[in-house]
Amino acid sequence: MTLSINPNIYGIPNCDMTQKALGWFKEKKIAVKFHDYKIEGITKQKLSDWSKKKSWEVLLNKRSTTWRSLSAAEQEKITNQAAAINLMMEQNSIIKRPVIEYGDQLIVGFNEEEYKKTFK
């Protein structure tokens, strides 16, 4: 399938949900650009932009191993967007994956139904 612009997929290659998303796009023959947090990092500006489209609570993966490995005191400090962004910059594996940018749209997490609606 040819789209006017290619989606950007942000994630970590060994993440199950990122792999699932990449597989979905490959199956649909949709070309994507993959951004590996571990190699390319993430900017504060990008996280701030994303937080305007989806709340920081959506972007911060509280079910992740990284979140669960934080002490209760560290977790309790994350009460606002600035604190969440700083944490996501320090430990980018705590960002919910994948994050997909497509034009002005932002999809967070693997959601096949949303993919079907967006990429038709």
Where are these regions (language model features)?
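Thiol/selenol-based redox catalytic cores and closely related redox-interacting motifs
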Residues: 37-120
